[in-house]
């Protein structure tokens, strides 16, 4: 699917990137590394944290691996968006969120050599790993894509 509908998903990705980069800029500009501001005591904090790895700090310092994987994933998402049918809006929204999240963290890796994380939540006494807007968009995007695939996807004609 080219045209107007694809543009909507790219605009969604651009909005995610803008919000992600703006919030990270605020954290870097106005908070000390390790500083934590309670939003809801024992539940939600804004905590200035840096991550040189993948989700939850895995694969620390493997920059070239992240660069390569991100370029491949972004290209795949763009190809998938272009092939969507007009009825596959949920998949398009999921892919737009994933695209924005992937590019948001990629920008950090390229320009900062680390990812700025700042959303720190607790589930009971469990301290969930610190994350950011891009991570959230990626997670929600993957969930939406799975919902689409398992509940709404229909086989293309000729592939049944």
Swiss-Prot record:
Asked if the Swiss-Prot or TrEMBL record annotates the protein with the keyword Membrane, the reply is yes
Keyword Hydrolase annotated: yes
Which GO terms of the molecular function aspect are on file? aspartic-type endopeptidase activity
Question: Could you list the residue ranges that cross the membrane?
Answer: 7-27, 61-81, 91-111, 133-153
Classify the main location: membrane
Give the main EC class: hydrolase
E.C. no: 3.4.23.36
Query: What kind of membrane protein is this, topologically?
Result: Multi-pass membrane protein
Any idea where this protein resides? Cell membrane
**Pfam families reported in the protein's UniProt record:** Peptidase_A8
Active site (UniProt): 117, 135
Q: Which reaction does it catalyse?
A: Release of signal peptides from bacterial membrane prolipoproteins. Hydrolyzes -Xaa-Yaa-Zaa-|-(S,diacylglyceryl)Cys-, in which Xaa is hydrophobic (preferably Leu), and Yaa (Ala or Ser) and Zaa (Gly or Ala) have small, neutral side chains
Q: In which pathway does it act?
A: Protein modification; lipoprotein biosynthesis (signal peptide cleavage)
Q: Which GO terms describe its biological process?
A: proteolysis
Q: Which GO terms describe its cellular component?
A: plasma membrane
Q: Which UniProt keywords apply?
A: Aspartyl protease, Cell membrane, Hydrolase, Membrane, Protease, Transmembrane, Transmembrane helix
What the protein does?
This protein specifically catalyzes the removal of signal peptides from prolipoproteins.
Family per similarity comment: Belongs to the peptidase A8 family.
NCBIfam families cross-referenced by the UniProt entry: lspA
- UniProt-listed PANTHER family: LIPOPROTEIN SIGNAL PEPTIDASE
Q: What is this protein called?
A: Lipoprotein signal peptidase
Species per Swiss-Prot/TrEMBL record: Geobacillus thermodenitrificans (strain NG80-2)
